[in-house]
Structure formats: C-alpha cells, structure tokens
Amino acid sequence: MSWRGRSTYRPRPRRYVEPPEMIGPMRPEQFSDEVEPATPEEGEPATQRQDPAAAQEGEDEGASAGQGPKPEAHSQEQGHPQTGCECEDGPDGQEMDPPNPEEVKTPEEGEKQSQC
C-alpha cells in the first residue's frame, strides 16, 4: 500500500466544562423512592402509603386467598409453547435448563436447528 499524503486526523483540544452551581440544598424526596411525597396521589388514600413492601405482600395474600391454589404454570412461559430453544431467561429472570440432548434433533437428520 502506498502513502497518499498527510493524515487528516487532528486531536481535538480537551474542553473543561465547569460544573453547575448549587442553587440550594438538594431535597432527597426528588431522588429517592423511599421518602413519602407531601401529598398522596389522587385516588389513593394516605393511610395505605406506609410501607410499599408490606402493602404488596398484603395484596398478594388477598388475591391468592380468593382464587384458591394456582396450577404449576411457573415452570413454563404462559401462552408460549416450548420451541426447544431454552437458552433465554424465563419470564421471572431465572435461567431455564438447557434442553435434553437426547430429545434435541441433530442437523444431520435433515432439519435445520434454530439458533437463539
């Protein structure tokens, strides 16, 4: 390869940007979900805004108690049949086991294997 002239690369000078001035004290309620707002949102009574974790547990217990035992639908994705490609995470973020090698067809059998 031959040299065709001068390089056009020129490093840009570094710019110093001054940080913004602090206008006043930072209010933690703007940045944290743990701090309760001064006024409750519309449609929500103020008495139920105690602890989000405790409130969620109470809702879960009430919902499951009225419906009875749930079928074992957690082992598979709901509404999606298994395609034989279980290399993605499940609906709850837990990894699924790889398919059984005895059940998986090899490409030598005439079919293409799907890739994730």
From Swiss-Prot:
Expressed in a variety of tumor tissues but not in normal tissues, except testis. Residues 1-116 are annotated as: Disordered. SMART domains: GAGE (SM01379). Residues 31-44, 86-95 have a biased composition (Acidic residues). Disulfide bonds: none annotated. Residues 102-116 have a biased composition (Basic and acidic residues). InterPro entries: GAGE, GAGE_fam. It comes from the Eukaryota. Antigen, recognized on melanoma by autologous cytolytic T-lymphocytes. Belongs to the GAGE family. This gene belongs to a family of genes organized in clustered repeats. They have a high degree of predicted sequence identity, but differ by scattered single nucleotide substitution. Their sequences contain either the antigenic peptide YYWPRPRRY or YRPRPRRY which is recognized by cytotoxic T-cells. This is G antigen 2B/2C. It comes from Homo sapiens.
